[in-house]
């Protein structure tokens, strides 16, 4: 009589009958073996997923190094030249003079350099700094000067552009007074009082003669004169 073989338990049953199989499958040993059997496949699948994620992360880190996307984008244009990478500043733990080959992966603990915004004039990969028409040959704009600045006329080649004179400051106005009628004007805003001294005497005639003596003032009242007929 054939016997039944259990793959999970790796053993043969004594009898090949439905009742014996049901009794064996209900045992705690069989259930533990079934659980262990499927757990090994879950662990293998989980480990394979972890390895795949690590490979994808390493591939993205190598592709997105400092300046890599910008250089790849600029290389798509005809006649474009790859922009050189900025030097990496040494950390306190890195010895001085440590060689860093261009294109090599970054060391652990090293921060990637900060790239300037694309399109800065004068930087490799950005638009060139333009001078005004008529500028002498060999002239160079001052760092930070606006585009189009040029040196002074008659300056030797290679001189810096002329500096613009600062704008005059606006006049200082007194603070506005309150609009309440009858409010006293502060002393600082009131006009200064003008005191008039004795008026100057009128100038004499131009002939050089001495001026006429001043006449005595006439009294404001008069006396009645006696008539001659009474005498």
Curated annotation (Swiss-Prot):
PROSITE patterns reported in the protein's UniProt record: ZF_MATRIN
Main localization (coarse): nucleus
GO CC annotation terms, alphabetical: commitment complex; U1 snRNP; U2-type prespliceosome
Record's subunit section: U1 snRNP is composed of the 7 core Sm proteins B/B', D1, D2, D3, E, F and G that assemble in a heptameric protein ring on the Sm site of the small nuclear RNA to form the core snRNP, and at least 3 U1 snRNP-specific proteins U1-70K, U1-A and U1-C. U1-C interacts with U1 snRNA and the 5' splice-site region of the pre-mRNA.
PANTHER family: U1 SMALL NUCLEAR RIBONUCLEOPROTEIN C
Zinc fingers (Matrin-type) by residue: 4-36
Localization per Swiss-Prot or TrEMBL: Nucleus
Annotated region (Disordered), positions in chain: 117-231
GO terms under biological process: mRNA 5'-splice site recognition; spliceosomal snRNP assembly
InterPro entries (UniProt xref): Matrin/U1-C_Znf_C2H2 (IPR000690), Matrin/U1-like-C_Znf_C2H2 (IPR003604), U1-CZ_Znf_C2H2 (IPR013085), U1_snRNP-C (IPR017340), Znf_C2H2_sf (IPR036236)
Biased composition (Low complexity): 181-193
Protein name per UniProt: U1 small nuclear ribonucleoprotein C-1
SUPFAM superfamilies membership: beta-beta-alpha zinc fingers
Family of this protein: Belongs to the U1 small nuclear ribonucleoprotein C family.
SMART domains per UniProt: ZnF_U1
GO MF: mRNA binding; pre-mRNA 5'-splice site binding; U1 snRNA binding; zinc ion binding
Gene3D superfamilies according to UniProt: Classic Zinc Finger
Keywords noted in UniProt: Metal-binding, Nucleus, Ribonucleoprotein, RNA-binding, Zinc, Zinc-finger
Function statement: Component of the spliceosomal U1 snRNP, which is essential for recognition of the pre-mRNA 5' splice-site and the subsequent assembly of the spliceosome. U1-C is directly involved in initial 5' splice-site recognition for both constitutive and regulated alternative splicing. The interaction with the 5' splice-site seems to precede base-pairing between the pre-mRNA and the U1 snRNA. Stimulates commitment or early (E) complex formation by stabilizing the base pairing of the 5' end of the U1 snRNA and the 5' splice-site region.
Pro residues compositional bias, start-end: 117-127, 134-159, 167-178, 199-217
